[in-house]
């Protein structure tokens, strides 16, 4: 009896993660369906997640249409590649961070913790939701970029491979960071401000809304510490012609460095998730 009582207490201290057993995958896949139903029933969330990056891309593409950046490249094309990276990060980091913080504050995580459901199933469900939304978001932004900014799809297997690993590493990286940062807001009301403010600033200095060459060097140095800058740089190497490499501060796409930075942040995000995730709000102790 004492051993059985000690197990929940130990799980509470470690975030409540039960072993990842085959049953967790079955429960997790079922949880993906639940998460998708809840997400698409919330029309405001659907509009916010999918429309905001697309609307920004249309606006920026229309404002800067026909304006040349350099070497025959349009400013709109630069924005399109950057906003695709920003969309990947926002869909995973911002949505997960705010969503999990809200569910914790409303007591939903506490109730899930008290059910027989394997703890990993919750994270599998969230991961499935992020993958579906991120793929859909990226397809939408690529389509808008092709219509508005003459963005072109990659024409070589090498570029498609680069797109694949940048997309996967970027999504995993920002999903883990979104789960980790969800523990910072103390209430659902404060979650959007706590999470969106630093992320918005990061977008401006990481080449999402402003070309990297126009960002002051000291701000570029700050941005280079975070993963968003490297995701955007990797996607520019996919969607822009090779001559656009001269617009990069380093004069190179730096694929090796992009991979190392993203892998380092994935490791850091995993550690943060394992050490900081809470099933209960601060009010519940």
What is the predicted role of each segment?
Residues 2-52:
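Aromatic- and glycine-rich beta-strand/loop motifs that create alpha-glucan
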Residues 2-7, 26-30, 208-248, 255-256:
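Short hydrophobic, aromatic-rich alpha-helical segments embedded in or entering the lipid bilayer
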Residues 2-13, 239, 249, 256-285:
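Junction motif at the cytosolic side of a transmembrane helix
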Residues 15-18, 45, 77-81, 89-94, ...:
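Short alpha-helical transmembrane interface motifs in multi-pass membrane proteins
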Residues 39, 92-117, 127:
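Transmembrane helix boundary and interhelical loop/hinge segments in multi-pass membrane proteins
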Residues 41-66, 76-95, 136-137, 197-204, ...:
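Hydrophobic alpha-helical transmembrane segments of multi-pass membrane transport/permease proteins
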Residues 59-67, 182-229:
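Transmembrane helix segments
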Residues 119, 123-196, 200-202, 255-263, ...:
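Alpha-helical transmembrane segments and their short interhelical loops
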């Amino acid at each position: 009896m004492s051993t059985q009582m000690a197990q929940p207490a130990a799980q509470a201290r470690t975030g409540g993660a039960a072993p990842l057993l085959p049953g967790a995958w079955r429960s997790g896949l079922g949880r993906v369906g639940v998460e998708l139903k809840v997400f698409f029933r919330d029309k405001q969330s659907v509009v916010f997640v999918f429309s905001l990056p697309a609307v920004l891309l249309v606006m920026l593409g229309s404002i800067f249409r026909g304006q040349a950046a350099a070497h025959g490249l349009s400013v709109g094309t630069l924005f399109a590649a950057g906003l695709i990276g920003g969309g990947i990060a926002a869909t995973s980091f911002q949505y997960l961070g705010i969503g999990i913080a809200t569910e914790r504050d409303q007591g939903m995580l506490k109730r899930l913790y008290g059910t027989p459901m394997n703890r990993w199933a919750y994270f599998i469900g969230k991961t499935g939701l992020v993958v579906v939304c991120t793929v859909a978001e990226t397809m939408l932004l690529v389509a808008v970029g092709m219509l508005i900014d003459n963005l072109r799809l990659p024409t070589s297997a090498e570029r498609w491979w680069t797109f694949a690993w940048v997309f996967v590493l970027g999504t995993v990286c920002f999903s883990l960071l979104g789960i980790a940062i969800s523990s910072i807001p103390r209430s659902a009301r404060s979650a959007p401000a706590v999470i969106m403010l630093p992320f918005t600033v990061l977008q401006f200095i990481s080449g999402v809304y402003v070309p990297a060459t126009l960002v002051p060097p000291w701000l570029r140095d700050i941005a280079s510490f975070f993963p968003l800058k490297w995701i955007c740089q990797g996607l520019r190497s996919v969607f822009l012609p090779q001559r656009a490499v001269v617009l990069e501060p380093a004069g190179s796409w730096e694929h090796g460095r992009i991979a190392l930075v993203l892998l380092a942040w994935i490791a850091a995000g995993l550690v943060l998730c394992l050490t900081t995730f809470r099933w209960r709000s601060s009010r519940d102790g």
